[in-house]
Amino acid sequence: MLSLAVFYFVFLGTEYLFDNRMALYTDPSGVVLAQSYILGVSVFGFLAYSLIEKWKSKSGNPTAFKAAGFFLPVPVIAGYVLLFAGTGYWVLLGSGCFLFLILGYLGSRTHYLAAQLLRGSRHPAKTVSVAYAVGLLLQFLNHNLLWGETVEGSFL
């Protein structure tokens, strides 16, 4: 369940960072609108997981998918760099949409694996809620023990 807690922490932390960065370039209603875009894109990533897994099993070439997974951190790091250092509404929105597409996919994968591990468990909801609470605790510690947006973001 540690993977769920880490996912919740990264997802919520990235959303918080995105909102703070967008607030530099738009008014509060613009931040809410941009947030709705990134959360909507994360739904596409979440739904894409099952389609990609089905496609992967039918393709007969798992090496290509492994290579894509191996190199995925490079554009993700670039997305975070743009989120930290990018200037302008559209740069931040683009990097945010990209990151949340990937986070949606990873969230779907994490929840699927957790569901597999919890199959037959007597208390799956309790386990997931504890993982969420741990993710929120990490978020609290990140915001209260680390100072500065760059340091907090680096912790993500």
Question: Can you say where each PLM-predicted feature lies in the sequence?
Answer:
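Symmetry-related core transmembrane helices of the 12-TM Major Facilitator Superfamily/SLC fold
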Residues: E152-L156
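Cytoplasmic membrane-interface "Motif A"-like loop-to-helix N-cap segments
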Residues: E53-L72
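Central cavity-lining transmembrane alpha-helices of secondary-active solute carriers
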Residues: V32-K56
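Helical-face signature of the major facilitator-like transporter fold
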Residues: L4, L92-G104
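Pair of pore-lining "gating" transmembrane helices in MFS-fold secondary transporters
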Residues: M1-Q35
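Intracellular juxtamembrane helix-capping segments at the cytosolic ends
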Residues: L103-R119
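Glycine-rich segments within core transmembrane alpha-helices of 12-TM secondary carriers
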Residues: G107, R119-T150
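C-terminal ends and interior cores of transmembrane alpha-helices
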Residues: A68-T87
